[in-house]
């Protein structure tokens, strides 16, 4: 187990350093000091490749300062994947130093106080288990985070938090919700390309939830038709009215008058079957990465379905981000913002081939995308490549 202590309590991980590490095999604990004033300091980094498994508290932040290795897993995400408790209360001293806005708080907080906090994490370390989930989430989201969003004032950095009810990450930092930037107030206009003559490219999945559900229930939606239009034609309604009907069926339960439509009948059957399994087994697992969702009296069958659907969306996207991170075209272009059913890229002027490769990866297995391009994030125009 590795417990990294960053120098700053408030700065983004890219703008701080590792103050110290506490490392434990469950029996022996080792404090490695780089910047804390309480002890002798060293310079050497720890070599983690010799360990079989390395569970890190806050792996996404840790990877700003250490290279990823295949033996690394996030402790909290490992417990979350198993539906086990991963909550550790922060000690009061950290709250005190936050209020003081001390820029190097963790260099000043006594070592024994850090060790007290570490002990609370150590108590739950024994429940950790290897999973792709606890490795790919912090690795993939951290990779996008590091790329930053470029503005005329420099870079802004997002902060993804996947420890939510559905594993769909929130993304708020310094008061800005990057997962829900408004389209009509000009706030997006500050985000531009970092490259000379570069542009921003955004790929949006068409009717993402509809197509994800279709995969779950074995219904084929034509790739050359928009998913919402495909359903609208079955209602005999215009698109705007049809969308409202669709959302009502998917998130509130299928109404009798739409039960004759195969897509909704099979969706309803899937929801009911999953709910019975949930009641019988007191848990279900997500379709791709097998994360457990335990019984909760506050859940009903439609809420459970929404949790599973959002988890499916996120898990597929995490696998996509992992594949994108392995593209090797000697490109400079990078993904800079992930927002559930779309990914925004900063693309160098000579790298259209990169976007073509990205599009191919994102569309695999029948998930068509739409492409928008712009000089800034507020002025994006649909295009074809």
Locate each region found by the language model.
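Conserved RNase H-like, two-metal-ion catalytic cores of nucleic-acid enzymes
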Residues: 1-90
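Short glycine-rich phosphate-binding loop at a beta-alpha junction
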Residues: 46-61, 204, 256, 334-337, ...
């Amino acid at each position: 187990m590795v417990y990294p202590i960053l120098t700053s309590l408030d700065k983004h991980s890219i703008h701080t350093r590792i103050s110290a590490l506490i490392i434990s095999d469950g029996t022996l604990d080792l404090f490695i000091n780089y910047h804390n004033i309480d002890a002798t300091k060293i310079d050497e980094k720890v070599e983690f490749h010799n360990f079989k498994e390395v569970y890190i508290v806050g792996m996404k932040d840790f990877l700003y300062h250490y290279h990823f290795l295949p033996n690394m897993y996030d402790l909290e995400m490992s417990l979350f994947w198993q539906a086990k408790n991963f909550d550790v209360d922060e000690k009061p001293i950290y709250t005190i130093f936050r209020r003081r806005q001390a820029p190097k708080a963790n260099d000043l907080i006594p070592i024994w106080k850090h060790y007290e906090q570490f002990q609370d994490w150590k108590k739950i370390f024994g429940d950790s288990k290897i999973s792709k989930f606890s490795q790919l989430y912090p690795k993939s989201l951290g990779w996008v985070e590091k790329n930053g969003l470029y503005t005329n004032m420099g870079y802004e950095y997002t902060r993804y938090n996947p420890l939510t009810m559905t594993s769909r990450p929130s993304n708020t930092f310094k008061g800005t919700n990057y997962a829900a930037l408004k389209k009509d107030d000009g706030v997006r206009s500050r985000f531009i390309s970092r490259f000379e003559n570069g542009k921003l490219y955004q790929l949006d999945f068409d009717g993402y939830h509809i197509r994800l559900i279709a995969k779950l229930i074995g219904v084929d939606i034509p790739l050359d038709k928009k998913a919402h239009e495909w359903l609208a034609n079955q209602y005999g309604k215009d698109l705007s009215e049809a969308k409202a009907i669709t959302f009502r069926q998917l998130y509130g339960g299928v109404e009798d008058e739409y039960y004759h439509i195969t897509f909704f009948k099979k969706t309803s059957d899937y929801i009911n079957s999953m709910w019975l399994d949930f009641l019988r087994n007191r848990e279900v697992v997500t379709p791709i990465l097998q994360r457990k969702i335990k019984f909760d009296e506050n859940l009903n069958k439609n809420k459970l379905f929404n949790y599973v659907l959002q988890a499916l969306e996120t898990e597929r996207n995490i696998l996509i981000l992992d594949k994108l991170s392995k593209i090797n075209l000697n490109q400079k272009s990078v993904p800079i913002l992930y927002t559930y059913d779309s990914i925004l890229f900063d693309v160098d002027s000579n790298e259209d081939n990169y976007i073509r490769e990205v599009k191919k990866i994102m569309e695999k297995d029948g998930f068509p995308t739409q492409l928008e391009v712009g000089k800034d994030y507020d002025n994006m125009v649909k295009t074809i490549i």
